[in-house]
């Protein structure tokens, strides 16, 4: 059994595991 997280960013969901690096789009906050 592996430990993982599901991250929602930029309208996408990404599954990441321990020690894994991901790249996400830069999110510009709305003023």
UniProtKB/Swiss-Prot annotation:
Q: What Pfam families does the record point to?
A: Ribosomal_L21p (PF00829)
Keywords tagged on the record:
Ribonucleoprotein, Ribosomal protein, RNA-binding, rRNA-binding
| Gene Ontology cellular-component terms listed | cytoplasm; ribonucleoprotein complex; ribosome
Task: Name the InterPro entries for this protein.
Answer: bL21-like, bL21-like_sf
Which GO terms label this protein's molecular function in UniProt?
rRNA binding
Q: Does the keyword Iron-sulfur apply?
A: no
Q: Which family does it belong to?
A: Belongs to the bacterial ribosomal protein bL21 family.
Describe the function of this protein.
This protein binds to 23S rRNA in the presence of protein L20.
Q: How does it assemble?
A: Part of the 50S ribosomal subunit. Contacts protein L20.
Protein name per its UniProtKB record: Large ribosomal subunit protein bL21
According to its UniProt entry, this protein's organism is Streptococcus thermophilus
């Amino acid at each position: 059994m592996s430990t993982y997280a599901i991250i929602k960013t930029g309208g996408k969901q990404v599954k990441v595991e321990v020690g894994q690096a991901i790249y996400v789009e830069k999110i510009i906050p709305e003023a």
